[in-house]
Amino acid sequence: MDTKKEIKNNNFICQIINKDLNENKNLSFYTRFPPEPNGYLHIGHAKSICLNFELASLYKGRCNLRFDDTNPLKENIKYIESIKHDINWLGYKWHGNVRYASEYFLKLYQYAQELIKKGLAYVDHLTKEQIREYRGTLNTPGKNSPYRNRTIQENIELFEKMKKGDFSEGEACLRAKINMSSSSIIMRDPVLYRIIFIKHHQTQNKWCIYPMYDFAHCLSDSIEGITHSLCTLEFQDNKFLYNWILKNTSVKHYPKQYEFSRLNLEFSILSKRKIKILIDKNIIEGWDDPRIPTLSALRRKGYTPSSIKNFCQKIGVTKQNNLIEFSMLEHCIRKELNQTAIRTMAILDPIKIFLYNLDSNYKEEFIVPNHPNNPEMGTHKIIFTNTIYIDRSDFKEKYDKKYKRLKLGEKIRLRYSYIIHAEKIEKDEYGNISNIICYCDLNTLGRKPKDNKNPAVIHWISEKNTLSAEFKLYDQLFNIKNPEQQENFLLYINSKSLIKKFGFIEKKIGEEIQKKISNNNIEIFFQFERIGYFCIDFIDSKKNQLVFNRTVGLRDTWDSKKIKTKNITNN
């Protein structure tokens, strides 16, 4: 995948950048990825990360990592470390040191003082509820705060008192003085500073007043020399305030904001608030539960950095909000794993087969490829004995003409091995099949049977070549395509989003995995033949009990000839 070429050819933002660079030959492209450290990154953030870092590489520019840490109530060091890890995992490196908006708090405070001295900001004592009430609606203009027309000197003194901690939380705030009748609600005297008495993870207890995101963001962009500030469409109206603040302060550099559509993914919730509800109600295990699209969850499910970057490249960058097919994301990882995953056999729901014409000490070894189309990936040994396991779904007791696998009185070929014939069954006290008695035709290794009819092929594992394992079969968490739009999204939980199976993998393969787990070499991917692509669950696996997560099934349902997206209003 030539990501740079794809970006240059298909990205409307590139057209803007090309124009800017052509008009100003001395301009160097400079962008940033500015997450708030109040949660874990998800697939939507990956789109922004890929866009910013790939553009910086394409234009030989720079991309900063800046944490917009202006709300210590919701922020945590663990989110900072997780975000840095995710960006590195995707294969990107930010320019220079990690930056924090909190590094600029003194400078931001000085810019706020400038606005006060120009009569463009005032200290207000309305409560949060009163401010909301005074702001008006889309159809009705707002009304001025009774504190709006204080003198400049009074506002200077009050803002200094806010900084010193002389007011309690909610008792005072600093607001921009713009226009309470503006058609844009965001321009109706927005709050610029509020009081929060809590220890900040970077500045400790140095500050008790904190700038709002809209105030800190544009000024931080300016301080860092950002040329193109890229954000999603929900910040489109914020651009009015972004430009107003820059225009009315003494900044020396004027970045430009451009918006693109956010990533909306079928059957998924991206809202941090809603994901937390799912966790609190024990519907999912945590932020890395493979049923949600956080990057840590996708990593645990078996998605690779290249598959996620390929997905972001395929969906492109537009100004139209669309609902992206989940099958496109699956297509990207399936296509990669088809080339790279080791082939092996696993039995998820075992049923025993006894081959009565073979001795109990019968043993035969077969050398099988790790990948059918890539000899360089090597081979491994499997053994064949008189007792083997197949998957319960590969046998049917009652005759069914359409059923092409093993059934009583019929034959089947074992993968890489012989043809067997099912003659009778044994059941336990509950009526469940416990044993299938079969005849093994030893003249059929690599040969057709006497009737010249090749039967279907199923996978198997010798009883003497098994290692027990748990298999987690993940499906969509929701049973509707756009749960984000539902008022009560919890009504649409898929009760079968996780099914656990307990079975076997090939012993030698399992032992190799156990060695790698102890060495923390945990990115191990397999195609369990006829089942799907799986990875080792590096969180739940123990040395004596391996756990595998299904990454994706074998069948590709996405039409790769055209990118299918759906209007986000459709369910």
Curated annotation (Swiss-Prot):
Motif 'KMSKS' region per UniProt: ranges: 269-273
EC number(s) recorded for this UniProt protein: 6.1.1.18
Reaction it catalyzes: tRNA(Gln) + L-glutamine + ATP = L-glutaminyl-tRNA(Gln) + AMP + diphosphate
Domain of life: Bacteria
Subcellular compartments: Cytoplasm
Pfam families: tRNA-synt_1c, tRNA-synt_1c_C, tRNA-synt_1c_C2
Alphabetic keyword roster: Aminoacyl-tRNA synthetase, ATP-binding, Cytoplasm, Ligase, Nucleotide-binding, Protein biosynthesis
Cellular component, GO annotation: cytosol
'HIGH' region (motif): residue ranges: 35-45
Primary residence: cytoplasm
GO molecular function: ATP binding; glutamine-tRNA ligase activity
GO aspect biological process, one term: glutamyl-tRNA aminoacylation
Family annotation (InterPro entries): aa-tRNA-synth_I_CS (IPR001412), Gln-tRNA-synth (IPR004514), Gln/Glu-tRNA_Ligase (IPR050132), Gln_tRNA_ligase_bac (IPR022861), Glu/Gln-tRNA-synth (IPR000924), Glu/Gln-tRNA-synth_Ib_cat-dom (IPR020058), Glu/Gln-tRNA-synth_Ib_codon-bd (IPR020059), Glu_tRNA_lig_a-bdl (IPR020061)
Sequence positions that bind ATP: 36-38, 42-48, 232, 262-263, 270-272
PROSITE patterns, per database record: AA_TRNA_LIGASE_I
Binding site for L-glutamine: D68, Y213
Subunit annotation: Monomer.
Family: Belongs to the class-I aminoacyl-tRNA synthetase family.
Protein name: Glutamine--tRNA ligase
